[in-house]
């Protein structure tokens, strides 16, 4: 019979390897890879990329989409905290839940006060590959089977932002698992994971 500590350690090990995504990171079909601000249809819109390979254009500014996402995840949009409980600055990694930790990377030239930063989720089963862009201080981000995404920051800076977000994500998940461990009841652990998965579909 598996003990509570073994169960939690097993979940942590699988989490670190990216396994059992349906159990740990909600339904992969609806799992977000990134949000990219764009003017493609002539207005301020957002491209949404999903783990299952879908790419959808939403005719809403990214500011509205992230606000709605925060509310859906039960968060206060203007008070998203870091993994150590501090209020997150504008371009710091943003944690919306165990399945959503975003790195801010500049994706377009600024026009007025429109959002210029895309949000790249590091809690996904893909690795981001960063290559040189067509101009100095630009890069291409390659992920999954999507076309390369042009960003307006150097490869070194982009890698730093992605690593920073991954570190924040790991700290958050480690703390979440530590809190679950306090329950001393494997049944509670299982129910928490199942309930969380159902609520985040």
Kindly give the residue locations of the regions a language model identified.
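Eukaryotic intrinsically disordered, low-complexity regulatory linkers and tails enriched in Ser/Thr/Pro
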Residues: 1-201
